[in-house]
């Protein structure tokens, strides 16, 4: 993937850039793997906002991604196409299995049309192949990792994401997460070799607010710019700094996004660096 920069023909184009999509081989998705997707506007079934800054955006169709590949062990597949997916930052790859079934997977870096993909403990260590952690050599870069055996890939699924298998001891493998955290994961959990493709996604300059609205993202308003009824930092005469330590709209102090005493904390070998005192 590369990034194409625009010339400053308008204020909105100045400094903006877009992916060149050279890796995309087909523009229309596989119909059998597409489902309708309705917009929520960030509201729950009661109509209340549960996630802020969501609303509008272009209509999308959801592509069914195969995050559990264990049922295709020993069945090779060929990469038929690399496609764009509006629902995620990564590209997706359409696989044609030799038994006739078609499935989408997250497209790793360096995967291209015509490549052969394998699943299972006997698969080769090459990008796109899916194996249990017990069969992957220490030091390998992986993505799309399960947290529980058979639970489907949960970790490292966005563009450019990767995890490194740093050690294996007993029934646990130690993984270095994108955050720097080192965590124990059951060796029966499966992972895909390589890092997720489209790594330059983070370097795109969106250029104008309108492009973010096309993506379904609404403005993020600072608390100090609100009225006191709307935010603890709101109000005051003229511009103010908020007058207190940073808090959320509901008064919760900023930072500290992890729940203390969580059951899975015992699996953390080394915590991520946060820059905050514990």
UniProtKB/Swiss-Prot annotation:
Pfam families: Ribosomal_L2 (PF00181), Ribosomal_L2_C (PF03947). Residues 255-268 have a biased composition (Basic and acidic residues). GO terms for cellular component: large ribosomal subunit. Residues 269-278 have a biased composition (Basic residues). The keyword rRNA-binding applies. One of its GO terms (molecular function) is rRNA binding. One of its GO terms (biological process) is cytoplasmic translation. Keywords: Ribonucleoprotein, Ribosomal protein, RNA-binding, rRNA-binding. Part of the 50S ribosomal subunit. Forms a bridge to the 30S subunit in the 70S ribosome. One of the primary rRNA binding proteins. Required for association of the 30S and 50S subunits to form the 70S ribosome, for tRNA binding and peptide bond formation. It has been suggested to have peptidyltransferase activity; this is somewhat controversial. Makes several contacts with the 16S rRNA in the 70S ribosome. This is Large ribosomal subunit protein uL2. The gene is rplB.
